[in-house]
Amino acid sequence: MTQTLLLTGDMNFQGVTAPDTIFAKVADALRDAGVVFGNLECCFFERQGHDPGEREGFYAPPAAATALANHDAVGCANNVTYGEDAVMASVSRLDQVGVLHTG
C-alpha cells in the first residue's frame, strides 16, 4: 500500500482573518494525502502591547489555527521569539484543533 507524505513549509498566519481560505486552492491535495506535515513559523497567541501596524511578527491570532484543518502535524521548534507563554499557548491551541506537533 502506498501512502503520500505531503510537506508544507514556513507557514506564518500573522494577520489572517479568514483561515478557511488559506489552503483553499490545495485543499483536495491536502485531504487526499496520507500524512500532511508542515513547518509552523508562528505562535498562536494574542500578543499584548504591540503596535497594530507592526509588520514584524511570528505570531497569529488563535483562531488562525483552524487553517491547519487538513494538516496532521507541524514542527514548531523555531517558534521561540515570544517566550514560553506564547509557545505553550500555541501548543495548547494546536491540541484544541487536533494538530500533532513536535519541536
Go through the PLM ranges and name each one.
Residues 1-103:
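Acidic, metal/ion-coordinating pockets
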